[in-house]
């Protein structure tokens, strides 16, 4: 397995993005987001997704100079227009604003419409936690999953993120697509030549399968919790569209590529009710209870959400970030 130093990955991404119209500062910030995604083990939304984003820039579907702006506000809630800019930077600024509103009011909400793909949603949940806030955020997507009981794709696997801060930086976070596996995870599993650990969707004959390529071909990803994930997807799309005035899943499906997405950023300041120390104590008791569980397998381990990611970051910092050589070489030639 080839590994690349995190700093080298940032440098190469920065170089390519500057060539495609980003200001030097924005190119560096955007490059850090891509590299951190791979550093965190979410390779599908780091290096592996980078060439696709470059193709969108070349087709003019992403405006590297556009910045999201607030177009209306009420109390601690704001509606922003992303102007089809670079999704991760717009989303980052929106969550930063939600956190600032939360520090003032206890809760801050930014509804971001007309944006582009935000890559890894966990970036923004973690950002909120780093600022001492509970972070809740989600995005809609192009139609890429059938509603429960359907064959054709009319809903999105709209990723949902929840993060809880800890003062030692060991934050607790769930970042999950509403399909059993995100399409990025299907891609990375296929590229690694592996099967999924459990069925992740149906093949073209309607049979459950662990073959990621078969699910990518059929487009029939399985909602998490079956009908529950389907219902949750629909409600998240409704709420996001209503609050932002942006595009719903079915509208995004008419654009060809996955652009013009809608995202919601919610930040809550838990120190409005308890000190940092008091909140840490509550969190630590709950996590200790989880860790005290008896593993189902003798060699197994029970982990809290985000624990595995922190280990991956440490390993990749020390050894280098794993890369698919073909994709990495393509970036070097850009």
Predicted regions located by residue number:
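Acidic, glycine/proline-rich low-complexity segments that act as flexible tails and inter-domain linkers
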Residues: 1-4, 11-29, 35, 43-61, ...
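Catalytic-core signal marking the mid-to-C-terminal active-site face
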Residues: 3-4, 9, 19, 243, ...
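Active-site cofactor/substrate anionic-group-binding motifs, chiefly glycine-
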Residues: 46-99
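A generic, well-ordered mixed alpha/beta core segment in the N-terminal half of proteins
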Residues: 77-167
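Phosphate/diphosphate-binding glycine-rich loops and adjacent basic-rich segments that engage nucleotide
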Residues: 145-214
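N-terminal nucleophile
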Residues: 155, 159-162, 177, 231-247, ...
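Small-residue-enriched flexible segments
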Residues: 183-245, 256-258
């Amino acid at each position: 397995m080839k590994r690349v130093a995190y700093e080298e990955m940032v440098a190469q991404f920065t170089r390519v993005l500057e060539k495609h119209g980003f200001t030097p500062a924005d190119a560096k910030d955007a490059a850090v987001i891509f590299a951190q995604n791979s550093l965190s083990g979410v390779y599908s939304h780091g290096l592996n997704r980078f060439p696709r984003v470059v193709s969108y820039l070349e087709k003019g579907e992403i405006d590297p100079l556009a910045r999201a702006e607030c177009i209306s506000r009420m109390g601690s809630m704001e509606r922003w227009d992303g102007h089809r800019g670079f999704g991760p930077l717009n989303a980052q600024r929106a969550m930063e604003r939600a956190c600032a509103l939360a520090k003032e009011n206890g809760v801050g909400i930014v509804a971001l419409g007309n944006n582009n793909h935000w890559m890894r949603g966990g970036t923004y949940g973690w950002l909120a936690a780093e600022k001492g806030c509970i972070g809740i955020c989600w995005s809609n997507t192009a139609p890429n999953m059938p509603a429960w009981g359907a064959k054709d794709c009319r809903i999105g696997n709209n990723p949902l993120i929840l993060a809880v801060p800890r003062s030692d930086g060991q934050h607790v976070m769930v970042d999950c697509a509403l399909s059993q596996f995100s399409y990025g995870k299907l891609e990375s599993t296929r590229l690694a030549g592996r099967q999924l650990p459990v069925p992740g969707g149906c093949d073209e004959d309607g049979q459950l399968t662990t073959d990621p390529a078969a699910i990518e071909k059929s487009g029939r990803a399985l909602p998490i919790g079956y009908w529950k994930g389907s219902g949750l997807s629909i409600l998240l799309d409704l709420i996001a569209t209503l609050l932002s005035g942006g595009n719903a899943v079915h509208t995004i499906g008419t654009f060809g590529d996955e652009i013009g997405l809608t995202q919601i950023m919610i930040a809550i300041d838990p120190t409005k009710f308890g000190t940092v120390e008091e909140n840490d104590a509550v969190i630590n008791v709950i996590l200790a209870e989880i860790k005290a569980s008896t593993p189902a397998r003798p060699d197994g381990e029970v982990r809290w959400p985000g624990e595995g990611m922190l280990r991956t970051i440490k390993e990749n910092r020390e050894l280098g970030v794993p890369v698919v050589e073909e994709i990495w070489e393509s970036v070097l030639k850009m």
